[in-house]
């Protein structure tokens, strides 16, 4: 009887330990380690301003390494799905992707003319090209990272706050390419307990990088075949100038037909910006100064918008290798 009783006790004890082990495993597996931003600024603006390419750089396949670099100091709070009772045994890991079309070899398509390769700096690692997963860091315990309110991260040394992107020419262009703010890359963060490097691009990114800027090209275009354009404004009586900023009475508007021709080797339309540069009239800066004090010339587009003589532009879309009129 004692032996039977003992066997029952042993069996019950084994079942108890098995139940405890299963419960512990279930609790351990319940934490994904994925992190999300709880407050602060989760966006980094990669605005490179206005840059100009030389004509020889504006060639298919040309790569401009580290075309733009940034080192921001965003402050934000991150909360991770992890065990706060064992936070000291955890480790950071990162992953990144891009919503842009992937072209291979870490290149992403910005538009028909340009592609970008993005490198992000993760603490303790060399700059890593997007896309990547399972990039771990050294020990860096954050006591409140598992709390719902999150842990404050920030400063230029924080992972993801610095990086760079390289530029690749997919096909030559003429004039300017304006890149409106677009999502360039996304950084995902994990805090793994026990320590590990596992992290994938699932869930919500902790940082999103927005690209914007303008790239000018010194392309092969000619205006009026390089010849001077003369405009006859006719004769106007001095008494007809009465209101500042208005045409004199009886004055006519001279329409300009400016021949423009581009040779880029591209099929389809070419985007061109004609730029106006002249001496401005000190009393009316929107006008070009003339030899007669108090009299200026105003240039407008087809919609009667004034083109500033201080670098105002007239955008055009014209066929390549064909004569066009602006």
From Swiss-Prot:
Gene Ontology biological process terms in this record: cell adhesion involved in single-species biofilm formation
InterPro entries named in the record: Adhesion_dom_fimbrial, Adhesion_dom_fimbrial_sf, Adhesion_dom_sf, Bact_Fimbrial_Adh_Pro
Gene3D superfamilies (alphabetical): Fimbrial-type adhesion domain
Induction conditions: Induced in the presence of epithelial cells.
Main location, first listed in the record: other
An annotated GO cellular component: pilus
Keywords: Fimbrium, Signal
Signal peptide as annotated in the record: 1-30
Localisation per UniProt entry: Fimbrium
Source taxon at top rank: Bacteria
Sequence similarity: Belongs to the fimbrial protein family.
Summary of the function given for this chain in its UniProt record: Part of the elfADCG fimbrial operon, which could be required for adherence to host epithelial cells.
Protein name as catalogued: Uncharacterized fimbrial-like protein ElfG
Gene label: elfG
């Amino acid at each position: 009887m004692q032996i039977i009783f003992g066997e029952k006790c042993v069996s019950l004890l084994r079942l108890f330990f098995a139940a405890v082990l299963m419960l512990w495993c279930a609790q351990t597996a319940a934490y994904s380690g994925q992190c999300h931003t709880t407050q602060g600024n989760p966006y980094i603006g990669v605005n490179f301003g206005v840059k100009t390419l030389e004509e020889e750089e504006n060639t298919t396949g040309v790569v401009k390494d580290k075309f733009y670099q940034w080192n921001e100091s965003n402050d934000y709070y991150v909360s991770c799905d992890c065990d706060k009772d064992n936070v000291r045994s955890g480790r950071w890991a990162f992953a990144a992707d891009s919503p842009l079309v992937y072209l291979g070899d870490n290149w992403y398509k910005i538009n028909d003319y340009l592609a970008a390769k993005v490198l992000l700096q993760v603490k303790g690692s060399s700059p890593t090209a997007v896309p990547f997963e399972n990039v771990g860091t050294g020990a860096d315990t954050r006591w409140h990272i598992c709390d719902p309110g999150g842990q404050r991260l920030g400063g230029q040394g924080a992972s993801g706050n610095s990086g760079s992107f390289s530029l690749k020419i997919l096909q030559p262009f003429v004039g300017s390419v304006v890149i409106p703010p677009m999502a360039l890359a996304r950084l995902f963060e994990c805090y793994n307990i026990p320590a590990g490097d596992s992290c994938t691009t699932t869930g919500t990114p902790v940082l999103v990088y927005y690209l914007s800027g303008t790239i000018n090209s010194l392309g092969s275009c000619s205006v009026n075949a390089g010849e001077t354009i003369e405009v006859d404004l006719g004769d106007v009586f001095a008494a007809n100038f009465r209101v500042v900023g208005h045409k004199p009475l009886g004055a006519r508007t001279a329409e300009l037909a400016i021949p423009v021709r581009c040779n880029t080797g591209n099929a389809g339309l070419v985007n061109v910006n004609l730029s106006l540069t002249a001496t401005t009239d000190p009393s009316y800066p929107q006008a070009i100064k003339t030899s007669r004090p108090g009299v200026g010339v105003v240039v407008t587009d087809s919609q009667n918008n004034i083109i500033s003589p201080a670098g105002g532009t007239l955008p055009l879309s014209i066929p390549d290798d064909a004569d066009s009129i602006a």
